[in-house]
Amino acid sequence: MKNFIYVTALAIAAIGASDSIAQRVELQSGDVSVLSGQKTVNIEYDYSEFGVGKFATEKEYLDKKSSEYNEKEAGKGDTWKKSWVDDRVNKYEPKFEELFNKGMEEKGIMAVHGKGAMYTLIVRTKYVEPGFKVGVMRKNAAVDFEIDLVESANKSKKVAQIDMKKVPGGQFGGFDYDSGIRIAESYAKAGKSLASFINKKL
């Protein structure tokens, strides 16, 4: 029993250490201090170009997986493919914004969808590892992000670029059999980490 508790504690510590390293936020260029005094920042998401797992593009991944599911059961792959895309609006983005806005409460800044904000955050997904959960075997999700802070009136004018690599996603307790749940946790952690980073710069 003592050995089990010890091993479990080590595992939790290792996960925590891994998450801490993986969530490092790197400012590639520019300065986010322009957000000081702002009440809102517009937010947009870009999924136009990213790899998934061992696949170079999302299209390759979706075509392969949906074909495999359809072979097992007619229509299952099409349903799965739609769910994969719908998870962006239904799961990923709400999680990102919830944790980002919670982290920015002290500074009085809120991410919004609209045209009123002076600056816009463009959250670009660059790579997704969906992970898996099969019985007692599991692999957490991980997502790479490139986040541009631009002027809303002229989005070609980049104010800052922030990168986050291998942001982990998974639920403690192992109830994340759905890849969408695991990936959503990566977005939640990314939103929280971004808010923490910006807070320190304002």
Model-predicted segments: where are they?
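Bacterial Sec-dependent N-terminal signal peptides
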Residues: 1-27
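Glycine-rich, phosphate-binding/catalytic loops in enzymes
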Residues: 5, 60-61, 139-142
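A structural "domain/chain start" motif
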Residues: 21-90, 94, 196-202
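Surface-exposed short loop/turn segments
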Residues: 25-26, 108-157, 169-177
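Generic short beta-strand segments
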Residues: 46-49, 124-130, 164-165
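Short secondary-structure boundary motifs at beta->alpha junctions and helix caps
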Residues: 73-86, 153-200
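Structured segments of extracytoplasmic/periplasmic soluble domains
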Residues: 95-106, 193-201
